[in-house]
C-alpha cells in the first residue's frame, strides 16, 4: 500500500512538472511518438534531448519530468541519456477501448527556465484478439414460403481490436441455399445477414446446420465461428414492425440502477405464434450488455449498471423484434447520458518550490492544474487563495495556474506561509476542493549586524596580565543561518601614533577583547578604537561601534626624591644657625610620584634623626623644621632620614637622607646658576635676583673691611656647607641662588626658586646674628615667610 501511495505521489509530481512545459509551447504542435501495444517494458521510444534540441546535461539540470493524466506512469525518462522508455507493457483495448486512434497525451516539463512541451503517445493496435460470438449457436426459423433474396439478421461477432485488425468480414460454410451479406452499421461495426438463394422445401430439407465464420483484417487474420441452425417452418408472411425506427432519450448519469430508460414497441399482423413478438438486443457489444437489459415481452429498456458521463456520453443500441415464425424487425435506440455535477474539482500539483528567497518578487512558487471531470458549467472552475498572503494566482494554458509572489517577502516577519487554494466549480450545487500549501521563506542577507551599544567604555587597570580579556562587545543579526553569524574585527585606527595592533585583539567569534601587553597608565591613560561586526552573508554586511579604554592607575611607582638628590657623590649639607628658634625652616624635601590620584598623594615623616626631638617634618609639604631651641650639647653634625610615602594600596615609599650642620654664623654667600638657561616664563624672577644681587654688591663694598676683620677673627669657624643643586634629568625644576646684599655681613640670605613654579615666589632664610655682636638683644628677626612682590612674581 505504501508503494502505491509513493507511486501516486511521484506521478502527481510528474504531472505538475508538465505544466511548465505547456506554458511555453502551448501553441506549438505536440510531439508524436508511436508504439505498438504489447511492446515489452523498457523499449526505447526516442531521445528527448535530441528532439528538444538540448544537451543531455542540460536536460538533467533543468529537471525534466513527464506529466500525464493517466493513473499509471507508462513512460520513463532516463535523466542520464535523455532516452524516453516504455515503463510497462500497454494494452490498447484496456487504455482506449474501441476509440481509434488511441492517443495518450502527456507533457514534458522543464524548469530553469520554465517550459512545457506537449506530446502524444499513439498506441497502435496489433491483432491480438480473435473475433468472438457471444452465443456459440444461433437458431433461425424460416418459412418455406420465404421468397429468395430474403435476408435474416444474424448475431454479430465481437472483436476488441480496431482498425484493420477489427472485424472485417463474415463467411458461411458452402451451401446452395444461403449466402452472407455484410453490412455496416454506420458506427464502425459490421453485421451479417443471411440471404436466401432459392426457395426452401421443408419436406425436402427441414433443417440446416451451417458454420458462420467471422474474420478480422489482421495479418495473419484471426477468426471466430458460430453454429447456425436453420429450422424450416410453414409460411409466416408478416414480420414484426416497430412503431418508430429511431428512439432518442436522455438519461441523467445519476439515474438509479433498474430505472427504465425507454420502452420500444413493435406490431405483427400474423396470429398465433407467428404474431407473438420477442424483444432482444441485436449485435450488442459487451459494454451494452453490461449496462442495459431489455424485457423480452414488453420491450422496456432498463439500466443494469450505473451510468458515468465522464466515461461514456452516448450509447447506440439496436433492438430486434422477432415473431414466432422467425421474422424480425429492428429499431435503433440512442441513449444520451446527461452530465450531473457529481465530481469535485481536482487540483494536480505539478511543482512546488520551497523554500523561496525572501527578496524574490514575481517568483513562481507552485504550478498546478485544475481538472473537473464534469462538463459544461459543472466542469468550469474558479480558483482563489486567501487575501492575507503576499501571493497571487496567475492562470496559464490548459487549466494550469501558477502561484507567484506578489512582492518581496520578509523572512524576519514570516518564516513560512500556509496558503489554501480553493477551487469551486460552477455547477448546481457547487462543489469545491481545498488544497493547502506550506511555503518556507529562506533567508537573504538583508540585515546588517547591530551592536548592543553605539559605544563601549572599558576600564582596565594598568599592569594587567596580557592575553586576558578586558571586556567584550556584542552584535546581533536578525538574519538566520550563516547570514546571522557575526565576525568581529578591529578597524584601522584613525590615530597614526596609536599602535593598536600591539595593544588589543578581538576574538572574531564572540567579540571578547584582549590586551596584548601590559598597559602603563603613566605612558597611556586612555585610547579609543573602532570595532566592526561583519556577517557571513553574500554580500557581507557590517556595522561599527566605538570602544573607549580607560586605563586605571595602579600604585606601581614609588615616590622619587627630587631634592635633596640622593645619588649625588657629594652629600647635601644644610647649615643651621645654633640660634634658630623652634619652627625654623631648615630645608624642604621635594618628591614626586609618577602615579595619579591618591596614589600620588605624598606624606612625609621623620624616620631617623641623630637627635630625636630636635627636628620635625611637616607631613604634607616635606618641610624640615626645628622642634626646639638648639643647645651646646647638640652635635654639630646632624643626620636625618625622611620617609616619603604615597597614599596607594599598598603604599610605596622612599627615603631621603639629610645632613644638617649646626653653625654659629654664615660664610660668604654664594650664587649657583643652573646649567640650563631658565625658561622665558621665569625671566622676571631672574631679573629680580639680578637686581637683588646688585644692591647686595653695593652694600658689600661699604662693609668689606668690616667683614674681612671679622672673618679673620673667626678663622676656626666651620665653613658654611654648600648644597649641591640637582642635575641630570631635573635641570629646570629647582634653582638655588645665594648672594650677599647691602645689609651687614652678619646677615646671609639663601633664595630658593623653582624653575617651573607658577607662583614666582622666593624665600629669605632668616638672618643669623653672629656671636660677634655682644650688644645684640638676642632677638632674632625671622623672615621665613614667602614673599611675592607687587609685580606678580
From Swiss-Prot:
The chain crosses the membrane at residues 689-709. The gene is PCDHB7. Glycans are attached at residues 169, 418, 436, 567. Residues 710-793 are cytoplasmic. This is Protocadherin beta-7. Gene3D superfamilies: Cadherins (2.60.40.60). One of its GO terms (cellular component) is plasma membrane. One of its GO terms (molecular function) is calcium ion binding.
Amino acid at each position: 500500500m505504501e508503494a502505491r501511495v509513493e507511486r501516486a505521489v511521484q506521478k502527481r509530481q510528474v504531472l505538475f512538472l508538465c505544466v511548465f512545459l505547456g506554458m511555453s509551447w502551448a501553441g506549438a504542435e505536440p510531439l508524436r511518438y508511436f508504439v505498438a501495444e504489447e511492446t515489452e517494458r523498457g523499449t526505447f521510444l526516442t531521445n528527448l534531448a535530441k528532439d528538444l534540441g538540448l544537451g543531455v546535461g542540460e536536460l538533467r539540470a533543468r529537471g525534466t519530468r513527464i506529466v500525464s493524466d493517466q493513473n499509471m506512469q507508462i513512460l520513463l525518462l532516463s535523466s542520464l541519456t535523455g532516452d524516453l522508455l516504455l515503463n510497462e507493457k500497454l494494452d490498447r483495448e484496456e487504455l482506449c477501448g474501441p476509440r481509434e486512434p488511441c492517443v495518450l497525451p502527456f507533457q514534458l516539463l522543464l524548469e530553469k527556465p520554465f517550459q512545457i512541451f506537449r506530446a502524444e503517445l499513439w498506441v497502435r493496435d496489433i491483432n491480438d484478439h480473435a473475433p468472438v460470438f457471444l452465443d456459440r449457436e444461433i437458431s433461425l426459423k424460416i418459412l418455406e414460403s420465404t421468397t429468395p433474396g430474403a435476408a435474416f439478421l444474424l448475431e454479430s461477432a465481437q472483436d476488441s481490436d480496431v482498425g484493420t485488425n477489427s472485424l472485417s468480414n463474415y463467411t458461411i460454410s458452402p451451401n446452395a441455399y444461403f449466402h452472407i451479406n455484410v453490412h455496416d452499421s454506420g458506427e464502425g461495426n459490421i453485421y451479417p445477414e443471411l440471404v436466401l438463394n432459392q426457395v426452401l422445401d421443408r419436406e425436402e430439407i427441414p433443417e440446416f446446420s451451417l458454420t458462420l465464420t467471422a474474420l478480422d483484417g489482421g495479418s495473419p487474420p484471426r477468426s471466430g465461428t458460430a453454429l447456425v441452425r436453420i429450422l424450416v417452418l410453414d409460411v409466416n408472411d408478416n414480420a414484426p414492425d416497430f412503431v418508430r425506427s429511431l428512439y432518442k432519450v436522455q438519461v441523467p448519469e445519476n439515474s438509479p440502477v433498474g430505472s427504465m430508460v425507454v420502452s420500444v414497441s413493435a406490431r405483427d399482423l400474423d396470429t398465433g405464434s407467428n404474431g407473438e413478438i420477442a424483444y432482444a438486443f441485436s449485435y450488442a457489444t459487451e459494454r451494452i450488455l453490461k449496462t442495459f437489459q431489455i424485457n423480452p415481452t414488453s420491450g422496456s429498456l432498463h439500466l443494469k449498471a450505473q451510468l458515468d458521463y465522464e466515461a461514456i456520453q452516448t450509447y447506440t443500441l439496436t433492438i430486434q423484434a422477432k415473431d414466432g415464425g422467425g421474422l424480425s424487425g429492428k429499431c435503433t435506440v440512442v441513449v444520451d447520458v446527461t452530465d450531473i455535477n457529481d465530481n469535485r474539482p481536482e487540483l494536480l500539483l505539478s511543482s512546488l518550490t520551497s523554500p523561496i528567497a525572501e527578496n524574490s518578487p514575481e517568483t513562481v512558487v507552485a504550478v498546478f492544474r485544475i481538472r473537473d471531470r464534469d462538463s459544461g458549467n459543472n466542469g468550469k472552475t474558479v480558483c482563489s487563495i486567501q487575501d492575507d498572503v503576499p501571493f497571487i494566482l496567475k492562470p496559464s494554458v490548459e487549466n494550469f495556474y501558477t502561484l507567484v509572489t506578489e512582492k518581496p517577502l520578509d523572512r524576519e516577519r514570516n518564516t513560512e506561509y500556509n496558503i489554501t487554494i480553493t477551487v469551486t466549480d460552477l455547477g448546481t450545487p457547487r462543489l469545491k476542493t481545498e488544497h493547502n500549501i506550506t511555503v518556507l521563506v529562506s533567508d537573504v542577507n538583508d540585515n546588517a549586524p547591530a551592536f548592543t551599544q553605539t559605544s563601549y567604555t572599558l576600564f582596565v587597570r594598568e599592569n594587567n596580565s596580557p592575553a586576558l580579556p578586558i571586556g567584550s562587545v556584542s552584535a546581533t543579526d536578525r538574519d538566520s543561518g550563516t547570514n546571522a553569524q557575526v565576525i568581529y574585527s578591529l578597524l584601522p585606527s584613525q590615530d597614526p601614533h596609536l599602535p593598536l595592533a600591539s595593544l588589543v585583539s578581538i576574538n572574531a567569534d564572540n567579540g571578547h577583547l584582549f590586551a596584548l601587553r601590559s598597559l602603563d597608565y603613566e605612558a597611556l591613560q586612555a585610547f579609543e578604537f573602532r570595532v566592526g561586526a561583519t556577517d557571513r552573508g553574500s554580500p557581507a554586511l557590517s556595522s561599527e561601534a566605538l570602544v573607549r579604554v580607560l586605563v586605571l592607575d595602579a600604585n606601581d611607582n614609588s615616590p622619587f626624591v627630587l631634592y635633596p638628590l640622593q645619588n649625588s657623590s657629594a652629600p647635601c649639607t644644610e647649615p643651621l644657625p645654633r640660634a634658630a628658634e623652634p619652627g625654623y625652616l631648615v630645608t624642604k624635601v621635594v618628591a614626586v610620584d609618577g602615579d595619579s590620584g591618591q596614589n600620588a598623594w605624598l606624606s612625609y615623616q621623620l624616620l631617623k634623626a641623630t637627635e630625636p626631638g630636635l627636628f620635625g617634618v611637616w607631613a604634607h609639604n616635606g618641610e624640615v623644621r626645628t622642634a626646639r631651641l638648639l643647645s651646646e650639647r647638640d652635635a654639630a653634625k646632624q643626620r636625618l632620614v625622611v620617609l616619603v610615602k604615597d597614599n596607594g594600596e599598598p603604599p610605596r615609599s622612599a627615603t631621603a637622607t639629610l645632613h644638617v650642620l649646626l653653625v654659629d654664623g654664615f660664610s660668604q654667600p654664594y650664587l649657583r646658576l643652573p646649567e640650563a638657561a631658565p625658561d622665558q616664563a621665569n625671566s622676571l624672577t631672574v631679573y629680580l635676583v639680578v637686581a637683588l644681587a646688585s644692591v647686595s654688591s653695593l652694600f658689600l663694598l661699604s662693609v668689606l673691611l668690616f667683614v674681612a676683620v671679622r672673618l679673620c677673627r673667626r678663622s676656626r669657624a666651620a665653613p658654611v656647607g654648600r648644597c649641591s643643586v640637582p642635575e641630570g634629568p631635573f635641570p629646570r625644576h629647582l634653582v638655588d641662588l645665594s648672594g650677599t646684599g647691602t645689609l651687614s655681613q652678619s646677615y646671609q640670605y639663601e633664595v630658593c626658586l623653582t624653575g617651573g613654579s607658577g607662583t614666582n615666589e622666593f624665600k629669605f632664610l632668616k638672618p643669623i646674628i653672629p656671636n660677634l655682636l655682644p650688644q645684640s638683644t638676642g632677638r632674632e628677626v625671622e623672615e621665613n615667610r614667602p614673599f611675592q612682590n607687587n609685580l606678580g612674581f
